[in-house]
Amino acid sequence: MSICHLFTGRYKGRTSHNMIEGHGDDAYRYKNPIRADFSSNVLYGPLDAGLRVHLQEKVAAVTHYPEASAQSLQAVAAEAYGVASDQVLVTNGVTEAIYLAAEAWRYLKIATILTPAFAEYEDACRLHGLDIHWQSWNSLTPDTRLPGGLVFLCQPNNPTGAALPPAHLHRLLRGHPDAVFVIDESYIEFTQATTSLLPHLMLPHMALPYVAPHAGDYPNVLVLRSLTKSCRIPGLRIGFAIGQSSLISRLRECKMPWSVNRLAIEAGLYIFGHGQQFWPPPEQLLAETAAWQEELRSATRWRVYDTDTHYFLVETPVAFTAAALKEHLITRHGLLIRDAGNFRGLTPYHFRVACQSSEHNRLLTEALRECSRTGL
């Protein structure tokens, strides 16, 4: 089922949508023991054993300053992503890159954000004085005319899990050559519904056998990538901004030194040095997600939204809000969900969950079955 609680409009000033006031993985707010955490989009499972040992061996490195701009990780990431080193900026998670983009292009005066959306896009634009144009994800077509300026688009989207078809996205990009697009690919490893834009950011003259026919197509596109989600390290904050060198240079002018800590750099070097073990094919995860969605629909009769990833939205009945459901689940069952009420374009009745192990999925299914029958 598609997202329908969306709107287009204009916004100035502060709202209650600030992400720092509500986000996933907020178990620290509760004294109750957590049996299962569905609130974060991070891939379920333990920290990679090899990475754990590596970080333990490198912990003494924190007695020294990190590289001012994480140069070693920048070079390794560039090779992994198939671009030149000066096309990459290492950031303290994707969140830092979002705020840097809003600062670097604040002179454009206006930003477009597709809704529903990760609230950090709004927070960053508001901080740097950009007027915001809201564009409904559902009403976006290849021929939609955006007002230009800075455009934030999450591909696949958070919190809906929906992805724009590649042809749709490319037509949109080519139709707005004067806008600066920030394409957040934080969850690209978790979908088969779209492909990364990175091959289109390669320099045409790069002597690589796999350079795409349209390499260098988009001098106005900044792609954001993350190691947080697929590598299960949200506490270390490792992100990347990737684009043509002119875009990266503008971002770098706004970036403070030493924003990426020593252990984060070490983790990134280890991850890129150990290849695809950190990026398993998504087929099994997506199949588990689809099966669990059907179980939830059958158990609750609630609205469970379609997704192209391993996370998705659910809408509660009007008898209780997602916030009330969240409190009930954590206090009665030790289960944590993501109240999605602070995502612009959603309602107080939306919550988001991410697929976990089959055992944990069953725990939430049964708890929600009980709520659907007896209330809170």
PLM region spans:
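PLP-dependent aminotransferase class I/II
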Residues: 48-50, 69, 220-298, 302-305
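Conserved PLP-anchoring active-site segment centered on the Schiff-base-forming lysine
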Residues: 104-126, 131, 138-144
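Conserved PLP-binding catalytic core of the aspartate aminotransferase-like
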Residues: 286, 299-333, 355
